Amino acid sequence: LGDVYKRQIHAHDWLTYPAGVHAKMVSGKPLCIHVHATDFDRSRGKVNPTVYATEKNGMDYADCIMCVSELTRQTVIREYHQDPRKCFAMHNAVYPLSQELLDIPRPEHKKEKVVTFLGRITMQKGPEYFVEAAALVLKRTRNIRFIMAGSGDMLDAMINLAAERGIADRFHFPGFQRGRQVYEAYKNSDVFVMPSVSEPFGIAPLEAMQCGTPSIISKQSGCGEILDKVIKTDYWDIYAMADAIYSICTNPSLFEYLQVEGKKEVDGITWEKVGLRIRALYENVLKNYGK
């Protein structure tokens, strides 16, 4: 980036906005803020007034607002009353997998298919829709196991829901996964599902696709703006989600298409390309600052 980054301030998400605003006032340098999520995403619309005020103040002072998706950009414009001309969609990307992760084997000749949810088990992520879709799938076949990996304030409720639906024997809750465990989970899966209610971006499907695992994502996910080789359903449409899961698990041709083409697609989504776009935006901010 040369010295471009030295001539402006870049603050990431609401906890850093007050420091960014203060640095701008003291230094006179332009402020770029990066919105990875808003409180509308985290709370399903039940916004904390203090958090909202901090977010909006940072946006009001910002000379440039980078959002991780067009979905988030529209939230910033609509809910925080920001000028569209200073708001930009800046999608996330993935780094190439290390050789160590590439060498993790995919199990062959499994007797049962594995469908995985991996992430925070909170209301933003829509875990209950995954459980309900699983219950529908298991009415059609018992040859599939479902995994909900992660932790969060809805974990106990999801364990109880699986029991209420009579699918506890087909459902597993291995807890929080870290590092290599995450990629082992992806590679052990036949389908990855991200049923988020409001997902500013969502990096997990890209990681799963890197591992050759077909993905199903909600239409309310920002990553869907740059992914085509996935199946997209509304988060609340458990019937469409169940159909997609069942189809991938029972149709080898569909599985292979999403596996091969999905990996090709995600391999072209790199941080180097994103970095060039950010640099160009930095330069544009500097050129126009103070005009």
Region locations from a protein language model:
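Aromatic "clamp/platform" in nucleotide-sugar-dependent glycosyltransferases that forms part
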Residues: 197
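Conserved acidic donor-binding segment of nucleotide-sugar-dependent glycosyltransferases
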Residues: 230-239, 247-252
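Nucleotide-activated donor-binding/catalytic signature segment of Leloir-type glycosyltransferases, i.e.
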Residues: 159-177
